[in-house]
């Protein structure tokens, strides 16, 4: 859910059990590396569509960046909201496509204290609610068939880089964390 214009590169690391990512990275990892902002800018957009001419699907997005005059401090941010109505293709009162509410927001900040000291922080939040089946406006236990997913995720990273005076050594300290809650 990160806008393409904010992505610097994507790293694919094959294989499991990496010392860096732990034993849960069974098949490998995919890392999305975001850009540091280089200019002040903002973009906004809305895409609206209809599923079979009946169910609305609206995606709104905003992203941008602010940077100091001397390019030593900056922030980039992004937000996306999606609202999709449920869709019943055959009129049996059961959804073929679930109702969806999704909100994703994030920001990346950086501060270059000097040429040799740099601090970067990133935070992302996602909240998604899906509901399908029938009797969508009632609790799931009152429906004949219910598909329901509620997911909340908050994650962040911090990275500090130090270069030696001769720039022949580099020290990096990195920390990350994530909290995910899923109710299905």
Can you annotate each of these PLM segments?
Residues 55, 69-71, 75, 79-86, ...:
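Gram-negative/organellar outer-membrane beta-barrel architecture
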Residues 3, 24-26, 54-60, 99-103, ...:
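Residues that define the transmembrane beta-barrel architecture of outer-membrane proteins
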Residues 13, 33, 63-67, 78, ...:
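Transmembrane beta-barrel domains of outer membrane proteins
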Residues 15, 33, 45-51, 78-84, ...:
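Outer-membrane beta-barrel pore domains and translocons
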Residues 1-3, 12, 24-48, 58-62:
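N-terminal periplasmic accessory domains that precede
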Residues 39-43, 57, 72-74, 118, ...:
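Outer-membrane beta-barrel architecture
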Residues 84-104, 110-112, 116-171, 177-184:
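Flexible loop and strand-edge segments within Gram-negative outer membrane beta-barrel domains
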């Amino acid at each position: 859910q990160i806008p393409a214009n904010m992505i610097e590169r994507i790293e694919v690391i094959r294989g499991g059990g990496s010392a860096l990512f732990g034993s849960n990275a069974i098949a490998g990892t995919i890392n999305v590396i975001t850009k540091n902002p280089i200019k002040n800018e903002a973009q906004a957009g809305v895409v609206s569509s209809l599923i079979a001419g009946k169910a609305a699907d609206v995606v709104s997005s905003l992203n941008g960046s602010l940077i100091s005059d001397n390019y030593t401090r900056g922030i980039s941010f992004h937000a996306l909201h999606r609202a999709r109505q449920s869709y019943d293709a055959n009129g049996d009162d059961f959804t073929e496509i679930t109702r969806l509410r999704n909100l994703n927001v994030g920001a990346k900040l950086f501060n270059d204290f000097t040429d040799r000291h740099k601090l970067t922080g990133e935070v992302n939040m996602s909240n998604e609610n899906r509901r399908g089946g029938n009797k969508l406006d009632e609790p799931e236990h009152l429906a004949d068939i219910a598909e329901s997913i509620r997911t909340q995720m908050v994650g962040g990273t911090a990275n500090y880089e130090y270069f030696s005076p001769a720039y022949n050594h580099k020290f990096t300290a990195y920390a990350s964390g994530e909290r995910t809650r899923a109710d299905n």
